[in-house]
């Protein structure tokens, strides 16, 4: 009985310490995020190409990609930058009802359609 009580006490202390550690500590270097501003929504994606800058002119990147480099380094990467601020809130679109399904999927399946 003594061993079981001692083991249960250890487990209880372990759970209490773990609970405290998870609820009262923060990750090192974590910063509270700013609220999302729809006017600043952007997506940056790598275009799988590298580029160089010589005499102030960059080598061509394909499509909508632009050459981005750090400081005065001549070598850079091609990225595509998409700005979502112009799209607005999709739930405020007047034609949002046209995008909704006309019939639920469960109804179609019960009728034998796929």
Swiss-Prot record:
Role played: Salivary chemokine-binding protein which binds to host chemokine CXCL8.
Protein name: Evasin P1096
UniProt keywords, alphabetically: Disulfide bond, Glycoprotein, Secreted, Signal
Biased composition (Basic and acidic residues): 99-114
Domain of life: Eukaryota
Glycosylation (residues): 50
Signal peptide from the UniProt entry: 1-23
Organism: Ixodes ricinus (Common tick)
Chain spans, region Disordered: 89-114
GO cellular component labels: extracellular region
Lineage: Eukaryota, Metazoa, Ecdysozoa, Arthropoda, Chelicerata
Coarse class of the protein's main subcellular location: secreted
Record-annotated disulphide pairs: 47-65, 51-67, 61-78
Localisation per UniProt entry: Secreted
GO molecular function, one term: C-X-C chemokine binding
